[in-house]
């Protein structure tokens, strides 16, 4: 029983870290990267689909994203989706190819992004701690019902705390790396 709880906690904590990583990929850092726009929803024959399903996205010269739609008819819809996004990007269309030059980040924008990063990191830490709290409550409940001994309860709580510390450290490392990338001129 305790092993199942610990495995469940580990799985849920890993998911929290993965969600934080996914959030980090969506933040613009001045470098061109396909993950910045691949999640944008494009109106494709009446249904909303991710950009990556209607076009290929490549990086050109490190600072330009190149979008090659698979159908010429979807060029306008892709442009519209990019304009509607809050990324502050300006697409330039040449025939069927859309180029998006990445403007350099201002110091003010870097600080804003850094604040957003810290906020997202705190949300991820809270999510990990919530998993820990749920598991600790389950362990205490098992102790009350005499399903586990007090020694097993303490051991399990210590292991869950170690898991929590490890995943929070992972979040901190991801945050530090992304902040360094954002603040780099």
Task: List PLM regions with ranges.
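Glycine-rich active-site/cofactor-binding loop and its immediate structural neighborhood
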Residues: 63-92, 96
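Glycine/charge-rich, flexible interdomain linkers and switch-proximal surface loops
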Residues: 27-44, 49-60, 92-104, 135-142, ...
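Short, intrinsically disordered, mixed-charge
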Residues: 22, 80-88, 119-123, 133
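Generic detector of leucine side chains in alpha-helical contexts
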Residues: 2-5, 24-27, 36, 40, ...
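Positively charged, low-complexity, intrinsically disordered RNA-binding extensions
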Residues: 98-185
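A positional/architectural concept
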Residues: 1-76
């Amino acid at each position: 029983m305790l092993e199942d709880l610990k495995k469940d906690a580990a799985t849920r904590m890993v998911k929290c870290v993965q969600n934080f990583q996914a959030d980090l990929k969506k933040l613009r850092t001045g470098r061109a990267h396909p993950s910045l726009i691949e999640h944008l929803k494009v109106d494709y024959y009446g249904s909303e689909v991710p950009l990556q399903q209607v076009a290929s996205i490549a990086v050109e010269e490190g600072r330009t994203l190149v979008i090659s739609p698979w159908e010429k008819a979807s060029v306008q819809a892709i442009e519209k989706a990019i304009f509607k996004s809050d990324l502050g990007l300006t697409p330039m269309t040449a025939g069927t190819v859309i180029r998006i030059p990445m403007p350099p980040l201002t110091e003010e924008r870097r600080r804003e992004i850094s604040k957003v990063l810290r906020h997202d990191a705190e949300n991820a830490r809270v999510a990990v701690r919530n998993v820990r709290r749920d598991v600790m409550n389950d362990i205490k409940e098992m102790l009350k019902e005499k399903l586990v001994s007090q020694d097993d309860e303490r051991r399990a709580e210590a292991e869950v705390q170690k898991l929590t510390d490890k995943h929070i450290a992972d979040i901190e490392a991801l945050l530090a790396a992304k902040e360094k990338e954002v603040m780099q001129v």
